[in-house]
């Protein structure tokens, strides 16, 4: 019984090319013979989805199939130009390599003498808020793999050279028959390197790199925030057998500050003042990150939580000529451990107080009582 190509791929008859390709890719991953050895059913399904995609990916074949079904390709249908299955130049082998190549280790890629790019490295660094404000140049030591100086990264013992793998002729890939088509696989003779090192370097054991701690200078720009990432190109792990080095990524975090809290480019500082300063007015000085002392005037009658804005005294914005502000929040401290005389004076002050002195608290409780009595009626 002939299969329905759309059902085989699990798509509707209106599926576009992108949907067809995605469906084929997913099913090919699922039923590929390499993942299902000695499984005839998986092999059958794999052939079916390949046949279905081979037909539906071609606009002419798809139009013929939609109109005539499988009869379009039988007995010389459509002028005999399509044939049955995956015949013709390229065929399913090309489809498989283009769409599914990475599963087989890169499809049509060719080895570059076994050279491999080194891995990217991550380095976590903490900085103070002051350092984030002003920027700095930091020296760090990073344990990493560097190019072996004994063999200059070739992996071969000095005086010798790697030889080209005869199994893959230096490509690092070999073709293997898979039913009615062939696919590329990593060469088992050289593990994809394209070269064979018969006499490996004693220092790096044929890897072309050794582990060593390096000292690097890192420029920390002004205005960095938690999670800011700095990339040092080529400062990561050395490549294998002369391959390019990876990159080093510096991930920055800013330590909590004793006095300032940060919100983007703005800073916040809670300053305690006495009750009398809040009532009578006064002034105080705060230290800012630019190294200056800034005077803050407190008007009489200042309430708890009042904020004063110091423009331009916050954090610089990374890579911009913009600076945030510093907000001073007043925290009025209630007197404790009063002496007898202090208590007497406060009691006298309370007797002399009027509604004008405390407009918020005056009448608050009576209004609250009236409110809840009204609800109960």
Curated annotation (Swiss-Prot):
CXXCXGXG motif repeats lie at residues 148-155, 165-172, 187-194, 201-208. It is found in: Cytoplasm. Zn(2+) 1 binds at residues 148, 151, 201, 204. A zinc finger (CR-type) spans 135-213. Residues 4-69 form the J domain. The keyword Cytoplasm applies. The keyword Metal-binding applies. GO terms for biological process: chaperone cofactor-dependent protein refolding; DNA replication; protein refolding; response to heat. GO terms for cellular component: cytoplasm. Its cofactor is Zn(2+). Keywords: Chaperone, Cytoplasm, DNA replication, Metal-binding, Repeat, Stress response, Zinc, Zinc-finger. Binds 2 Zn(2+) ions per monomer. Zn(2+) 2 binds at residues 165, 168, 187, 190. It comes from the Bacteria. GO terms for molecular function: ATP binding; heat shock protein binding; unfolded protein binding; zinc ion binding. Belongs to the DnaJ family. Participates actively in the response to hyperosmotic and heat shock by preventing the aggregation of stress-denatured proteins and by disaggregating proteins, also in an autonomous, DnaK-independent fashion. Unfolded proteins bind initially to DnaJ; upon interaction with the DnaJ-bound protein, DnaK hydrolyzes its bound ATP, resulting in the formation of a stable complex. GrpE releases ADP from DnaK; ATP binding to DnaK triggers the release of the substrate protein, thus completing the reaction cycle. HAMAP family: DnaJ (MF_01152). Homodimer. This is Chaperone protein DnaJ. It comes from Brucella abortus (strain 2308).
